[in-house]
UniProtKB/Swiss-Prot annotation:
The keyword Ribosomal protein applies. InterPro entries: Ribosomal_bS16 (IPR000307), Ribosomal_bS16_CS (IPR020592), Ribosomal_bS16_dom_sf (IPR023803). Pfam families: Ribosomal_S16. GO terms for biological process: translation. This is Small ribosomal subunit protein bS16. The lineage of its organism: Bacteria, Pseudomonadati, Pseudomonadota, Gammaproteobacteria, Enterobacterales. It comes from Edwardsiella ictaluri (strain 93-146). One of its GO terms (cellular component) is cytoplasm.
Length: 82
């Protein structure tokens, strides 16, 4: 099953997440099909905290991809900001 979820990057105690489309059987930070955005939970000041390609997200959802709970909340936030 294809899913849209977060893949963790960054350093110890400084997380940075890529929003990726991947097969649900792959490891969290493993192989992915497409990168559709990023999320920086500790962004401050003028740093960009969230960027999503909403067109690609809607494309994958229309193809049957499931969305994780956290990514669903981020999509809502991005749609509100757009």
């Amino acid at each position: 099953m294809v899913t849209i979820r977060l893949a963790r990057g960054g350093a110890k105690k400084r997380p940075f997440y890529q929003v990726v489309v991947t097969d649900s059987r792959n490891a969290r930070d493993g192989r992915f099909i497409e990168r559709v955005g990023f999320f920086n939970p500790i962004a401050t000041g003028s740093a960009e905290g969230l960027r999503l390609d909403l067109d690609r997200v809607s494309h994958w959802v229309s193809q049957g991809a499931t969305v994780s709970d956290r990514v669903a909340a981020l999509i809502k936030e991005a749609q509100k900001a757009a």
